[in-house]
Amino acid sequence: MLQQLWYGKSGWRWLLAPFALLFAILSGARRFAYRRGWCKAYRATVPVVVVGNISVGGNGKTPVVIWLVEQLQARGFRPGVVSRGYGGKAPHYPYRLDAASTTAQAGDEPVLIARRSGCPVVVAPKRADAVRLLEQSGEVDIIITDDGLQHYGLARDIELVVVDGVRRFGNACLLPMGPLREPVTRLKRVDAIICNGGEPAKGEYAMRLVADVPRRVRDDAQATEPLPRAVDALAGIGHPPRFFATLAGLGYELHQQVGYGDHHAFDRDELVARFGQRPLLMTEKDAVKCRTFALDSWWYLPVSAELPASLLDTLLQKLPSLTVPRSGSGL
């Protein structure tokens, strides 16, 4: 319902205008308080890069985080990642992921990032607590926060915003009247805007997701021969139609395409009842939640972000100046 309200044409949204105004006042006052120093932001001893967005829903932040980690590792940096760990309930906070960590403990995105990149990943409701743990470890020289653009309790040195290039900003209204956490003017203060799909606006960096060979959910084994053209598909992400469009573009005929809410907790019986023994394709983010109970007929599609080298060059140009003592909130 809200998605239709935000991204379609509906006069109903004006009924939510008073709530959007209240949200604007409260969030704006909070942001102003941090910028003026009335509220103190934690300043890390190493550079902090935020990868976030100004709208709710999945815009492709996690592939960007993985891309950034891999690019930094290739250039000799030792990155670590912090996240809120949404959807998980860890035994304690801050919680550092290890090989045995589950999505029930840490959330799906942190588990995926840790598996794909191999870098240290720490989750905590207060990201500053996660940052402190990474600092104390001595293992990292730069920290990337997955989401958290609006988490002003953590000072940052670089801000990257990912935009859905197809849906853009919907009706451009603030929550709950529209999908925006912050007004579009907030983008004037960020270091780079990444456009995921669609046509990038002037000054934005174009990003596309490149699909790899499907892998079996149960054991990550790569498919040795093409999957049947006719498959079922599920996606428990912020915008499932994007995944289904990717599969259709790869030539798959989707008998069933079922979208679930972001961070949906899947159950084996639920999925078997819905899809039976038929070949089933899902996102890698969903696969990390289904691995322990997956059937042999369940597969996921790995995707990687492809971004211009000029984006990394821009970031690296900023990093040398961050080795000197820094002050302020970076907001």
From Swiss-Prot:
ATP binds at residues 55-62. The keyword Transferase applies. It catalyses: a lipid A disaccharide + ATP = a lipid IVA + ADP + H(+). One of its GO terms (biological process) is lipid A biosynthetic process. Its EC number is 2.7.1.130. Keywords: ATP-binding, Kinase, Lipid A biosynthesis, Lipid biosynthesis, Lipid metabolism, Nucleotide-binding, Transferase. GO terms for cellular component: plasma membrane. The keyword Cell membrane does not apply. Pfam families: LpxK. InterPro entries: LpxK, P-loop_NTPase. Transfers the gamma-phosphate of ATP to the 4'-position of a tetraacyldisaccharide 1-phosphate intermediate (termed DS-1-P) to form tetraacyldisaccharide 1,4'-bis-phosphate (lipid IVA). This is Tetraacyldisaccharide 4'-kinase. It comes from Aeromonas salmonicida (strain A449).
